[in-house]
């Protein structure tokens, strides 16, 4: 039996929790718990409140997810 496909959502980090966990508010205003993927952790990428991130959620548990990408904020031109 094949695994069901994971779903990707865009969201904003609302709160930083201990042990590399975060509260992320998705585009549809649902707040979920998310942890950092291994590649982000391995490369010491910092995630702060307000960062835009991509979250992968399993269809089996829609309350938890995994942060797979942090969007780079555009710098304002002067």
From Swiss-Prot:
Residues 1-72 form the S1-like domain. Pfam families: eIF-1a. Coiled coil: none annotated. It comes from the Bacteria. Keywords: Cytoplasm, Initiation factor, Protein biosynthesis, RNA-binding, rRNA-binding. It is found in: Cytoplasm. GO terms for molecular function: ribosome binding; rRNA binding; translation initiation factor activity. InterPro entries: NA-bd_OB-fold (IPR012340), RNA-binding_domain_S1_IF1 (IPR006196), S1_domain (IPR003029), TIF_IF1 (IPR004368). Its main location: cytoplasm. One of its GO terms (cellular component) is cytosol. One of the essential components for the initiation of protein synthesis. Stabilizes the binding of IF-2 and IF-3 on the 30S subunit to which N-formylmethionyl-tRNA(fMet) subsequently binds. Helps modulate mRNA selection, yielding the 30S pre-initiation complex (PIC). Upon addition of the 50S ribosomal subunit IF-1, IF-2 and IF-3 are released leaving the mature 70S translation initiation complex. Component of the 30S ribosomal translation pre-initiation complex which assembles on the 30S ribosome in the order IF-2 and IF-3, IF-1 and N-formylmethionyl-tRNA(fMet); mRNA recruitment can occur at any time during PIC assembly. Belongs to the IF-1 family. This is Translation initiation factor IF-1. It comes from Mesoplasma florum (strain ATCC 33453 / NBRC 100688 / NCTC 11704 / L1) (Acholeplasma florum).
